[in-house]
Regions:
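Hydrophobic, aromatic-enriched interface-forming segments
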Residues: 124-168
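Short, flexible, mixed-charge acidic loops at enzyme active sites
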Residues: 17-20, 95-110, 162-165, 209-221
Length: 251
């Protein structure tokens, strides 16, 4: 059976999508129905899922996360498939959206104001391209036999100009600005490092949280019995898995 390693943040882990993956570390939010598990089932792959909620590119490459070693340590060179969904936490993308949905009084807190500050987001975005390039380069070196596929983020906002209550138009516009830069940086890193790309964002433009058939969850309080706000739901994970399967085996 071919070995498949899944790397990434909560957008790949699937926090709140039941059931949890057996043996998942505390705080990882790793679902047994995330896209990696679904792809492995469809293609009969031997899955090693090290996705972890809150992960940054540094957690993929060099830094521990809670009890987990850097995700790249899961690669042993025998992999035939590696998927990567990462980068949003480097630039505060989902925290920005969650913060924008908070009451006005809470948004005055310094840490929240910083997340909603355009200059601060631009500063964070300035280093994203290099960080994603480093991930692609390192994974290709560690897994030379593998097809390495970057999977970008599902769409989390309606089209620019469309109401996204409780987010203000200003905060929704900032969210789109970060989302577009994240998509662009992911695509550029994939091209530059010889990796492939699955464009989950483009495929989900009509399946944002405010749509009739959402693939992601919108604003709300994080509750343990449902998917985390501004993250994929079960339908979204199924859709991303299908995109990956189609990329690997178009027939």
């Amino acid at each position: 059976m071919s070995r498949y390693v899944a790397l990434g943040s909560s957008m790949a882990a699937g926090p709140g999508i039941k059931p949890s993956a057996p043996g998942a570390p505390f705080g990882s939010g790793r679902s047994a129905r995330n896209y990696a598990h679904l792809v492995a089932e469809r293609l009969s792959l031997d899955l090693v899922d090290v996705t972890f909620s809150g992960a940054t590119t540094a957690n993929v490459l060099t830094e521990r996360q809670r009890s987990a070693t850097p995700q790249i340590d899961a690669l042993d060179g025998s992999e035939e498939l590696v998927t990567i969904t990462i980068g949003g936490n480097d630039v505060g993308y989902v925290p920005l959206l969650m913060s924008a949905a908070l009451p006005r009084l809470v948004r005055r807190l310094p840490s929240i104001r910083e997340l909603l500050d355009r200059d601060a987001r631009e500063k964070a975005l300035a280093g994203l391209g290099d960080a994603l390039h480093a991930v692609g380069t390192a994974v290709r070196a560690r897994a030379p036999r593998a097809r390495v596929i970057f999977v970008d983020y599902l769409t989390l906002l309606p089209a620019p100009g469309v109401a996204a209550a409780p987010l203000s138009s200003e905060h929704a516009e900032l969210g789109w600005f970060v989302a577009e830069r994240l998509e662009e940086a992911t695509a550029a890193a994939a091209r530059a490092t010889g990796c492939e790309l699955v464009c989950a964002g483009q495929a989900s433009r009509e399946h944002h949280p405010w749509s009739a058939q959402p693939w992601t969850v919108g604003a709300g309080w994080p509750l343990p019995w449902r998917p985390t706000p501004f993250h994929p739901n079960a339908a979204g994970m199924r859709a991303v898995a299908e995109l990956i399967v189609e990329r690997i085996d178009p027939a």
